[in-house]
Regions:
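Active-site region of the double-stranded beta-helix
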Residues: 1-20, 32-184, 192, 197-241, ...
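Fe(II)/2-oxoglutarate
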Residues: 1-5, 167-179, 195-395
């Protein structure tokens, strides 16, 4: 099935990635028309009060801001000031139809996906002037929001003191100043200051993309390295003349040189690949698994009726490929864990890779792949895939 791409008709994915990605903003008029009418404000206010939701309630009164985080209750929404916003994270967990809209951004590998956040605000509501350490596509799903973009920021950017959220006093010269209507999408690069104010009751959906930090990778490297016995052997250090209490610079440089040599070794390539893959495939939020077991007969009947299997977009499924003896070997990672090749037949691994690449699998494809339905049941119960029934398929 051909997927809609969230880009202007005159800009290709290759052009966007070379000219706009992490460089400059882009307005995409009617970039996600499928989003219009998918949710109403009351849907989000109700969801924010669910005990399993990750939500924030931000309000402003006389330039003093307040923040309340989950759990939220109906009482929290009583006697609010005029300007307030409620935000709910991880929306793909709650709506597979919304999660499928990630495919509109398949020109960016899914290992960079963060989550879909929604913000509801009545007229005048906002979360203030700020910047984010990630790239985001701001999609208008309901009502209108006025967006302003300003200067690029960094770690030296100053925030207002005495506020519970990161707020900037000013954004410098504005480079964008427009109102987004339902279906419109605004791409905002990482570290670009932005300020969105509801023109009327509105819902804005944020499709965030994030890269790992060096600290996350170092932590993962240390964890992965503990499983390699070769790294438990002490280093051999050339011993220069030194007084009893001194750790000499020469010894430090010797250890450093050996560590650099290790980082450039084939063993390190394996460790680093696994550490990076596990880090970027981890979910930020706890996965909500299905309440009921998947039924083989029901799945087979659904597929026969025209249903398809798709990746559950609240899970992260990625794969790496390496060349070994002139053969390409794939390694699959799901939600931060490497999948042992012995646990899944080769044909099922190939099917899982196709699902990770955004394909929908129907009955004919499943039969041709010769993958048993009980394997699909396991994937459903683990939250890896979902069944899209005919009436729920998004065109």
């Amino acid at each position: 099935m051909t997927q809609h791409v969230c880009l202007p008709s005159d800009i290709s994915p290759e052009q966007f990635l070379s000219e706009y990605w992490q460089k400059k903003p882009l307005l995409i008029k009617k970039g996600l028309p499928q989003l219009v009418g998918m949710f109403e404000p009351d849907d989000i206010i109700g969801l924010a009060q669910d005990e399993d939701a990750t939500a924030r309630l931000i309000s402003e009164n006389n330039q003093q801001w307040s923040l309340k985080t989950s759990p939220l209750t109906a009482k929290d929404f009583q006697k609010l000031p005029k300007h307030w916003t409620v935000l709910v994270q991880n929306m793909e967990q709650w709506s597979p139809a919304l999660g499928n809209l990630w495919h509109a951004f398949d020109f960016i590998p899914q290992w960079q996906r963060d989550d879909i956040m929604v913000s509801y605000a009545p007229s005048g509501g906002s979360v203030g002037k700020h910047y984010d350490n990630y790239d985001v596509f701001l999609a208008q799903g309901y009502g209108k929001r006025h967006w302003q973009l300003g200067k690029y920021c960094d770690q030296t950017t100053q925030f207002e003191a005495g506020q519970p959220i990161r707020l900037m006093n000013e954004m410098g010269e504005l480079i964008f100043d427009e109102v987004l209507e339902p279906g419109d999408v605004l791409y905002v690069p990482t570290n670009l200051s932005h300020y969105g104010v509801a023109v009327e009751d509105c819902l804005t959906f944020s499709f965030g993309f994030r890269r790992p930090t060096p600290l996350q990778l170092l932590d993962s490297l240390a964890d992965v390295a503990t499983h390699f016995d070769d790294l438990a052997i002490p280093l051999k250090i050339n011993q220069p003349a030194a007084v009893a209490g001194e750790l000499s610079i020469a010894s430090i440089q010797d250890i450093k040189a050996q560590m650099i040599a290790l980082l450039n070794s084939e063993l390190s390539d394996e460790i680093i690949t696994q550490a990076i893959s596990e880090t970027v495939s981890k979910r930020q939020y706890e996965l909500m698994l299905p309440d009921a077991y998947a039924d083989i007969d029901e799945i087979q009947s659904a597929l026969a009726a025209g249903a398809v299997i798709r990746q559950d977009m609240s899970s992260r499924i990625i794969f790496t490929q390496t060349e070994t003896d002139s053969q390409t070997q794939a390694k699959i990672y799901v939600n931060g864990c490497a999948i042992d090749a012995d646990d899944i037949p080769a044909n099922a691994q190939s099917l899982l890779i196709r699902l990770a690449n955004g394909e929908s699998v129907d009955e004919q494809i499943l039969q041709a792949a010769d993958v048993e339905t009980d394997i699909i049941c396991d994937w459903i119960e683990n939250g890896w895939v979902v069944i899209d029934y005919p009436e729920e398929i998004i065109g």
